[in-house]
């Protein structure tokens, strides 16, 4: 079991607001339900000039060599808006992102991310702007994220973020919704047994 306690990685700045899930991964790539292999389609229409992925858009930031191994995405408000496709999160995780930092996220995207163990960090708009300035003036800079302390450290400056207890617990203990269900399987079976007995007794009484 891999417990996520923190992550240090290269930060790529994507200074665009309202990036929707169709931009993150276009609908033509949603035919599979296996989570693996979606990274190559991440930001497809921005990364490639042609539909066959033969010609890269050299102006798009993810195609810059310095960001080849970036694992932290810094972006603007309302990231992940649009349709609720979980494939958007799968593509980000499969590409190699561990953390996304923004002023706000779409609600469904937010929950899908934590279900797939992708840490989303919300900071104020002013803090995000400050971080963009740092990243743009220090290309290839690394951020140090501590989930335990709920902090982001950049050039010895520390930014604190909030995270609800449920998502905090799940990330620290490497748990998804299925794992949580299995942890309570005995209680679930006990409850189902009691309900089944109750319904049988009620049916016998009514008959």
Curated annotation (Swiss-Prot):
It holds the Pfam family Aconitase_C. Pathway: Amino-acid biosynthesis; L-leucine biosynthesis; L-leucine from 3-methyl-2-oxobutanoate: step 2/4. CDD domains: IPMI_Swivel. Its EC number is 4.2.1.33. PANTHER family: 3-ISOPROPYLMALATE DEHYDRATASE SMALL SUBUNIT (PTHR43345:SF5), 3-ISOPROPYLMALATE DEHYDRATASE SMALL SUBUNIT 2-RELATED-RELATED (PTHR43345). It comes from Buchnera aphidicola subsp. Acyrthosiphon pisum (strain APS). It is an enzyme of class 4 (lyase). Heterodimer of LeuC and LeuD. InterPro entries: 3-IsopropMal_deHydase_ssu, Aconitase/3IPM_dehydase_swvl, AconitaseA/IPMdHydase_ssu_swvl, IPMI_Swivel, LeuD. The gene is leuD. Belongs to the LeuD family. LeuD type 1 subfamily. GO terms for cellular component: 3-isopropylmalate dehydratase complex. Catalyzes the isomerization between 2-isopropylmalate and 3-isopropylmalate, via the formation of 2-isopropylmaleate. This is 3-isopropylmalate dehydratase small subunit. GO terms for molecular function: 3-isopropylmalate dehydratase activity. It catalyses: (2R,3S)-3-isopropylmalate = (2S)-2-isopropylmalate. Keywords: Amino-acid biosynthesis, Branched-chain amino acid biosynthesis, Leucine biosynthesis, Lyase, Plasmid. GO terms for biological process: L-leucine biosynthetic process. It comes from the Bacteria. Transmembrane segments: none annotated.
């Amino acid at each position: 079991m891999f417990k996520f306690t923190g992550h240090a990685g290269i930060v790529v700045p994507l200074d665009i607001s309202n990036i929707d899930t169709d931009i993150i991964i276009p609908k033509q790539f949603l035919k599979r339900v296996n989570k693996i292999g979606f990274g190559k389609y991440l930001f497809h229409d921005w990364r490639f000039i042609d539909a066959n992925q033969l010609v890269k858009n050299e102006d798009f930031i993810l195609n810059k060599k310095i960001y080849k191994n970036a694992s932290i995405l810094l972006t603007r408000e309302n990231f992940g808006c649009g349709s609720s496709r979980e494939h958007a999160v799968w593509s980000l995780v499969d590409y190699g992102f561990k953390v996304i930092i923004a002023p706000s996220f779409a609600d469904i995207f937010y929950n899908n991310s934590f279900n797939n163990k992708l840490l989303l960090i919300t900071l104020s708009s002013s803090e995000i702007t400050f971080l963009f300035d740092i990243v743009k003036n220090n290309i290839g800079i690394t951020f140090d994220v501590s989930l335990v302390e709920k902090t982001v450290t950049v050039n010895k400056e520390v930014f604190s973020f909030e995270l609800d207890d449920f998502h905090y617990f799940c990330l620290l203990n490497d748990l998804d919704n299925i794992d949580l269900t299995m942890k309570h399987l005995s209680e679930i079976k006990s409850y189902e047994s009691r309900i089944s007995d109750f319904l049988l007794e009620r049916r016998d009484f009514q008959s």
